[in-house]
Amino acid sequence: MSGVSVSLHDPAGVLAAIESSDRFLVQQVFKPIGNEYRISVPSPGSTEEGRALLYVKQKKLAIKEDIRFRPASDDGPHLFMIKSKTVFEFRGRHEVLDADGQVIGQLEKDFGRSLLRSHWRVRDAAGTELFEAYEANWLVALLRRFADLVSDWLAALTWLPFNFLLVRSGEQVGTYRRVLGKLRDRYVLELGPGFEGVDRRLVIAFAVALDALQDR
């Protein structure tokens, strides 16, 4: 992992490595039921995985969303998690909790704006908006929705680029893009200087939510 030295299973080391990074790779792992991911810091300019920092598992058949981020691939203690506030979360709001169960932020899908172009908001524990994210290309967003509504032969359109712009105070401060040509979903998240002071746990939780919860 470029420029990052961390014990594979040391929670403090993993969190420190996350907070010092501005570029992350999210790799979906094939599982017959449920979503799993690996989070790593790729080398500059690369879209290949670095050494895994976090292993992410979405709880199977859960009544409420339960997605945990762990420093090891087993089912040991988690460092943080995404959890729905209610059994049926119609508002698209999900809390991000630390290892002690304290709320550190909130992810919210704006369903009104997402009808034509997916739109998310990320807030801190006090409810203050930290940044918003929306699909980079409105035409691609419309084509993807059209493909979902018509016959199967247009299903290939769902493989169009799935890219988001991250905006803070009206300024673009990051990007999130799918790496094409991979069997399993792979995304690269890049953060600019405008992300200083934003808890990286919230940013990583958002990146995973875009794949795991996008269609909820």
Regions from the language model: what does each represent?
Residues 2-216:
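Intrinsically disordered, low-complexity proline/glycine-rich segments
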